[in-house]
Structure formats: structure tokens, C-alpha cells
Swiss-Prot record:
It comes from Actinobacillus succinogenes (strain ATCC 55618 / DSM 22257 / CCUG 43843 / 130Z). This is Uridylate kinase. Its EC number is 2.7.4.22. GO terms for cellular component: cytosol. ATP binds at residues 12-15, 55, 59, 162, 168, 171. GO terms for biological process: 'de novo' CTP biosynthetic process; UDP biosynthetic process. The keyword ATP-binding applies. Allosterically activated by GTP. Inhibited by UTP. Catalyzes the reversible phosphorylation of UMP to UDP. InterPro entries: AceGlu_kinase-like_sf, Asp/Glu/Uridylate_kinase, Uridylate_kinase, Uridylate_kinase_bac. NCBIfam families: pyrH_bact. Homohexamer. The keyword ATP-binding applies. Belongs to the UMP kinase family.
Amino acid sequence: MSNPIYKRILLKLSGEALQGAEGFGIDPSILDRMALEIKELIAMGVEVGVVLGGGNLFRGAKLAKAGMNRVVGDHMGMLATVMNGLAMRDALHRADVNAKLMSAFQLNGICDTYNWSEAIKMLREKRVVIFSGGTGSPFFTTDSAACLRGIEIEADVVLKATKVDGVYNCDPAKNPGAELFNTLTYADVIERELKVMDLAAFTLARDHGMPIRVFNMGKPGALREVVTGLTEGTIIS
């Protein structure tokens, strides 16, 4: 087994990545596969933090456009990430991986409230820490939460799992000839207006020198390849 190039990672999983072909909810087979891939990393000695989106269950911004108060919609979206976190924690436990679910806001009896020093302690003990509830504030995406938690826990990289193989010069779904980038600078992304993540999240990562790696979690084994330094996905630094 190859040696990992990262000691501690923050893995950002979108809610859509959990829904499979169903188009809504959680596909148990995908959840179990992700848990096993994370287990591989723990066996390699990598410390893993996870941030989950909630778009498979609820999208606050979409309902805000339909007239719902944006703050209410975002609060509902935050709760959706907790539901995904509970499912991921359960899948990890079934795979015999120690995992702790933390929320950005209090949910007594369901999960722990986010505590920075406790999270660091658990990561050092090789327990997977799942950060749910976004940043705890409305108007911030779960990409912002991923970059924030990644910076806080001093991760070596934020790994953004998507449905495509990395960052392209245009939408590969619309243009089969789209060019995949292996490496980019933060300036490249802004100048070319490439869609990596929302600007607030991206500039947070840039300002703190946090590398971002975008890859396709749908490819079995891709997570291991990313962590062992193989040319998988796009690295932005």
C-alpha cells in the first residue's frame, strides 16, 4: 500500500453524492462504499474530518426563491446536513470505524456540539470527525463550512468530492471536449471564473493558503488515489 501524502484531510461530500440514481434521499449502497473508502484512509494512518452537504434532502436557497424566508430555509438546510451526518456516522460504525458527529449548534441527545479542541483530540486518536450544521449561520454554504473547518483543524488539504473528474475549462456535461486541469492557482480560478465553489468559500481557502483538491468520488478507489498522491482530480493552491 502506497504511503499517504496527507496526514490530515477535510473531506467535503455533497448531499447529492449520497443520493445515487434516486435523485433524492440517501442511497445506502453509496453510503456504505464511502464508509469503506474512509476506513481505508484510517488504516493508512490518515486523520479524517468530514463535512456533508444537505442538498439531497433540502435546499434553502431554492425555497427562498419560491418565497420562503432565507434564514428559515438555511436553518432547514443545516438540519438536513445533520441528518446526513447521522447516516454517515452509522455507516462508519457498521464498518467498524470510530466516528464522532458534531453539530455547529446544540442538539442535545443527538450529537455533540462542535468543540475545536475535542475535534483535534479525536482526530489524533484516528477517529473520524463529522462536522454537521454548516457554519451554524445562514447565508453560508457547506463549502464555506468545509474550508472553515479545514482551516480550524489545520488539515493539509480540503478534498471536494464531486460527480466529475476535477475542474474543467467549461461544463463537461455540455461540452464533451472540455479540458480537465491537473493543477491551478487560486488566481487562475478567479481569472477564468471557473466553478470550483462559491466565492466566499474559495477566498477563505485562498487567504489561509488551504489547498483544495477536486475529484470524482463516484470512481471507486479515487479517494485513496488522491491521498496517495496519484494524479487524480485537480489541485488548486
